[in-house]
Amino acid sequence: MDSDDDMHDMDSVDYDYYSGGTYDDNDSDETDFGFGEADTDDAAIIASYRSKSNYVVLKEEDIRRHQNDDVGRVSAVLSITDVEASTLLLHYHWSVSKVNDEWFADEERVRRTVGILEGPVVTTPDGREFTCGICFDSYTLEEIVSVSCGHPFCATCWTGYISTTINDGPGCLMLKCPDPSCPAAIGRDMIDKLASKEDKEKYYRYFLRSYVEVNREMKWCPAPGCEHAIDFAGGTESYDVSCLCSHSFCWNCTEEAHRPVDCDTVGKWILKNSAESENMNWILANSKPCPKCKRPIEKNHGCMHMTCTPPCKFEFCWLCLNAWTEHGERTGGFYACNRYEAAKQEGLYDEAERRREMAKNSLERYTHYYERWASNQVSRQKAMGDLQKMQSEKLGKLSDIQCTPESQLKFIAEAWLQIIECRRVLKWTYAYGYYLQDHAKKPFFEYLQGEAESGLERLHKCVEKDIEVFELAEGPSEEFNHFRTKLTGLTSITKTFFENLVKALENGLADVDSQAASSKPANSKPSSKTKGGGKGKGSSKNGGSSRNPDGN
């Protein structure tokens, strides 16, 4: 455990984690908390709280509007129908500039490649009856349907063909004429005309999703059931985004938001949490293989006399793994094994014991970090539930009791949102700590982590416990304004501290390196004098560090 002196030294490291945040009980109550006046919806509040200029959350109607705008632009510039423009954009992955460049470079080649034909490729036979190219039945002209190529098929076969391809998946967006040798594209007009209502919904679902899935700057929100997309502009170091559904995730890897940990570390941590490797570590640390059948056996009683499970039933000594029949008073009796102790002194069991001890230590270390990682996740989920309960049940009552409009109580929601965000950050600091290889940085990291936990607990207590006296009051209290100032102050300080903590961890705790580097001249002074046998001109110049605690 770190001494008090160590803690003081770490606290003196030249990094202002509290810069920008002040707490004063006498601060003015006229504070703008950054929320709208009327919108109390959870999603809107979270979106407002986490909104950043480097991304935009798109609803389905927004995506559809973007699609229609692109289709209209291509249609106007190339003087083609909207259906043909849609077909071109699908082929060129919704790139308007690519469509224009390719079209004006070689229109004929583009038409041939995409399947937008200028005229029929087959001659319509004279007569009142036509033969369907799929079922080969005869139909009148009114019952025959064809696209730009002119191949005749009956409406029933067309419907079946379209339905089959739509139910096969997104490939239906590149649908071609049923004739195997024909490249003619089938556009949205045929879907509207011949597909069933259910098939139309599926087709346009694929059509909508194609706009996002081919765009490198857009991704769907990975939350189950969410139908929003994120348009990410970049330009910042953070990939964390928040959807209107309140789900926060990393735009780069689509895992949950995980600052200050990088995506590679998150991938390793998640894999470790779900992999069988930890089960094997537990088995290795807490069991030994049966000397006869080699199955792992856990020792669950105090006696060293072990009996393997049927059908093996081999009896052996837990310490030396030899047959129990060889044990008696000469080997130490039932609860000790002189043979094992002697062999251990000779080094015969050192390797196996060392492996088992290493596995046990590794498991204990992993368990330490995982339990705290998971605990903060549970606390975060509970805080989200408490926020929802506060907004749906308690806020109105508190407004009535304190005679304060709900629009002036948004500071409470802001505090809860800060707690939710801090729990997320604190949770991932444990994954950061697990993979932190530089042992010199560990004490400072754990100090910062401890300070973060302490500050967060103060904020959590204030918004969860201290508010109860005002919720249970019979009328307005003069102390409520003091509570408002206290809570907003704690929220601001906690936010600033966690923001600086994230930056410090993302920079690899560079301040520890800089502190070590700046202390090297002072530390090297004694050795310089020893080597030189006295104060030379150079040693005198280098020895006058202001960081020397003796002041020499």
From Swiss-Prot:
Note accompanying the cofactor annotation: Binds 4 Zn(2+) ions per subunit.
Gene Ontology molecular functions: ubiquitin-protein transferase activity; zinc ion binding
Protein source organism: Arabidopsis thaliana
Listed SMART domains: IBR
Binding site residues for Zn(2+) 1: C132, C135, C154, C157
Associated pathway: Protein modification; protein ubiquitination
InterPro entries associated with the record: Ariadne, E3_UB_ligase_RBR, IBR_dom, TRIAD_supradom, Znf-RING_euk, Znf_RING, Znf_RING/FYVE/PHD
GO biological process terms held by the UniProt record: protein ubiquitination
Binding-site list for Zn(2+) 4: C250, C253, H258, C263
Enzyme Commission numbers on file: 2.3.2.31
Protein name listed in UniProt: Probable E3 ubiquitin-protein ligase ARI5
Stated role: Might act as an E3 ubiquitin-protein ligase, or as part of E3 complex, which accepts ubiquitin from specific E2 ubiquitin-conjugating enzymes and then transfers it to substrates.
Active site location: C303
Protein family: Belongs to the RBR family. Ariadne subfamily.
Chain residue ranges for the region called TRIAD supradomain: 128-341
Sequence positions that bind Zn(2+) 3: C221, C226, C243, C245
Domain of life: Eukaryota
ZnF (RING-type) intervals: 132-182, 290-320
Pfam family, one: IBR_1
Positions of Zn(2+) 6 binding: C317, C320, H327, C337
Biased composition (Low complexity): 514-530
Cofactor: Zn(2+)
S-S pairs: none
Catalyzed reaction equations: [E2 ubiquitin-conjugating enzyme]-S-ubiquitinyl-L-cysteine + [acceptor protein]-L-lysine = [E2 ubiquitin-conjugating enzyme]-L-cysteine + [acceptor protein]-N(6)-ubiquitinyl-L-lysine
Enzyme class (EC, first level): transferase
Region Disordered, annotated ranges: 513-552
